[in-house]
Structures are given as C-alpha cells and as structure tokens.
Amino acid sequence: MGGQCAPTAGDRYTPRSEADVSDPIPILELPHRQARALLRGGAPVFLSIDPVEYHGPHLSLRNDHLVSTGLSRRFHAALCEARVGQPWPFLLASTLDAGVDPTQGPGSRAVAFRELCGLVVRACEALADLGAERVVLMTFHGAPLHSIALQRGVDALLARGVRALAPLNLLLVDVATSPPEPFAPALAHVPEPERAPMLAALRHDFHAGFMETSFALALAPSSVDPIHRTLPDCPPITPDARLLRLARAADRVGKADVAAELRVVAHGVGWSKLRPFPGYTAQPRHATAEAGEVFVRYAVSRAVPLILDVFAGAPPPPPPMAWMEQLTLGGRMPGLDIPLEVVADLAP
C-alpha cells in the first residue's frame, strides 16, 4: 500500500551551482516522490508536442522537437534571469511525437485532429494529477489544427487551476500579421537584390526554409545536413485563388488579421501543389546559425514576458486561425494530398 511522505527541506529544489539550473530534468523519469517534490515549488513543466515530419533532405524528421527543446531551454534561462535568486529547475515532460497535418514525405506520421486532442488532454491532465502548477506546451509545428489541439490541453489545465499556455500561438500571429522589419538583421548577410524580396516574403517561409533551417542551425546544429547550402530555391508559389478572394473579402469588412491568415493558408495550399514537391519553402541555402540567433532572440523577447504574465494570472493567447476547426468540420475533412512519388529527391 502506498503512503505519503511529508515534504522536508530537502524536497525543495536547491541548485548546487548556476550550471545546475539549466540542466534538463526529465520529470517523468524521476522517482514519483522526487517528481512531486520538485513540482511543489511551482516550477513550470515544458511539454513538447511535435510531429515526426518530413523537412526536406537537409533537416531531421524530429526537427520540430529539436527546435522546441532548444527554445524551451532558452525560455527557461530567461525565466530564471527574471527570477533573480529564485531559479526554477528545468523540468521536461516526455515528448509527444504526434502532430496534425504534417508535411507529407518519406517518414512523416500523421495523427488525426481528434486523436491528438485526446492525447494532449490526457497528457496535460496527468501532469495536473502529478502536481504541476505551471505548464508550457511547446511546439514548432504551425499547422492550425495542431495549435487548436494544444489549446485543448491548455483549457484542460486551466480548468484544473493550472496556469498554462502554448507560446507559439503568439509567435505564429506575429509572423502572419506583423511587419517583417524586426527580422531584417537575420538577412544582413544576404546580398541584394535578393535581400529585400526575401524579407517581404518571410511570412510565407513556413517550412524547412531559410527561417526554420536557421532556427535549427542555432539550436540543434548537428541535426542539419550541409546540403542545405546547395539546395535549389523553392519554386515560385501560386497562392490558392479562392482563399485569396476570401482574404480580400475579410479586408473589406475590416478583418485584417483574418485576411493575413487566409493569405498564409493560400500560399500553403499553393505550395503543396508544386510538382515535384520540394518539401521546403524559400531559400534554405541562405540559412546560418547567426540568422537563427536573431529569430531565437525575437522568440525569447516575445514569449517570455507572455509566459510570466500568464503565470501571474493573465489569460493565455488563443490559437491563430481558430476558424480552421469549423472550416474543416472539426478536422474531418482530409488534409493536403502530396503523394510520395512527387516528393523531389534532392539528395545526391
């Protein structure tokens, strides 16, 4: 029969050195008593939910997980800086290797929307049962239904009195709707006349291109194949005409953010129809770790104040493109079809 152990002073987290603060602690691999003791101090748990997904020939199938974990480390470090003298341990929950609407290609695994909703909610409720008081749901997968599924987990945690958020929601909105000028330093090394059009089109660089490859070079460099330097640019994308018409209609009624989201989706649909299908957007050849650091610093500057606000009681940001759930009949409509035989073989 199990029994309860009264918490002692030794149960509280006391780092042996400054380096200990950044050492990841896989909370679900600790003895149960120790895991609960660590959570009693209110330290946030980072839960990564990312697909196994094709990212072209130059990135790994778990690239989203690797970037999520790297960002979790940077977010945690910034949170500790904000809590001078009161560091939190870096608590990681086991990753859910699952995602809705992954880019199709060799090795990709698709999970249905409703199935992922169930997986996320059960994982979050289990963390609440364990004693988590704060949870950060991390992902680097921007599919709208994926973000909505993560929000189901956020809502389940909030209902249990746990403060929680998915910070990528804010970053996705930034990329889709905000001017790209804050990212200009990431393109300082790109010669003109390429630089200006690259910056203007950055919001449409949504998969395994210059931006994501730079993130990976900054956060998980050993996972990036140098072939990215010689890959041909993604061919020009013809956005879906019907979605562009909807975007113009949204603009006319004053829904500028919805219009911007519809344009991103229109480019995504057009990208999926490229034949052969490259598996990446934009120009991975220009990606560098230095550019990745620009993107990482921006992510930290936007996400960490938000995390602190939510931990203090503010509401978390909603998922972008929440209308996608209704548009797809709750995820029942099939996603984009990219047969394996049309995926470009760009590896030598």
Regions found by a protein language model. Name each.
Residues 10-134, 140-348:
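Extended, histidine- and acidic-residue-enriched regions that form the cofactor-binding/catalytic faces
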